[in-house]
């Protein structure tokens, strides 16, 4: 009897081997979340030394933090796009999410879902702290179709509401410090 292994079986087996190696061999990820994160802010506030007027100057953003097209495109979509879905990601990246998850694991030590969630949390924290965006707009910017998804994520991760998290993060002078 011949054993036939299809593409999906091969991918599943490969993913299992990679997961095992990543969890059990002292695997060191190539990139940290801080290295991958693309800030949503394009300008930084400063005060004119003569007039004291608040002005903005452009900030440089590394739009290709990994130099790997597939990962950089994912980061650009997740960090800089308005609302998107898993289908949008799959179509724009041209890869199945299971395959992409293994790719993420190799580069970051996190599978797609964990990486995506970590980026969403970081993005939401930045938007809540430095902008006066409505909560629903923050949620959309983080890839949720409505506020409830962001609320549930914050309740699960921080054990607090989005508004409570905003009050915890925000310091005097933060709003307007950066511009999208």
Q: Across the structure, where does each feature detected by a protein language model lie?
A:
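Short alpha-helical elements of helix-turn-helix
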Residues: 65-72, 115-122, 147
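Basic, amphipathic alpha-helical hairpins
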Residues: 51-85, 104, 108, 125-134, ...
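Short alpha-helical "recognition helix" segments of helix-turn-helix
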Residues: 88-93, 138-139
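Terminal helix-turn-helix DNA-binding modules in bacterial transcription factors
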Residues: 106-142, 168-180
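DNA-contacting interfaces and partner/effector-binding or oligomerization modules
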Residues: 1-57
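DNA-binding alpha-helical recognition surfaces that contact promoter or target DNA
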Residues: 102-103, 114, 126, 149-153, ...
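Sequence-specific DNA-binding recognition helix
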Residues: 132-168
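Short coil turns linking two alpha-helices in DNA-binding domains
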Residues: 92, 96-98, 145-146
